[in-house]
């Protein structure tokens, strides 16, 4: 056992004296290469009408004007990307065969905007006109929000698959569960 300790000690002493590949940093002498491209993004949050639309149930033309105004501002501030929240609480701010329309858009979950339009398609087209990338921002886990004003739509996951929901539903308007 003592022999092993001596060998390890000898190895450590020898290894400590070997020249290492030294790269001494001298402040101010080496600049890292600039990134090939900067990502300057702004978020447009739609849950609880944080950023857009300013309130639920606005006329479609007003919704469009507000969205275009946000995209104009992002371009003016030299952003090159927008992250647009399109799925807030297992609902959609785009035409979806699987999930209901968002209450933050129309005021009632599951209600189609009138006249019908696709906010995501509009956002993509208008962002590209301004030289902005548009990234669709999905929240994959949240199924409800405490500020919900309307009951879950009939095709909402809370109603179609309540067994997979792990939240307290007593305070959700019209959820039918406690």
Residue ranges and their predicted role:
Residues 81-85, 133-139:
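Outer-envelope exported proteins of Gram-negative bacteria
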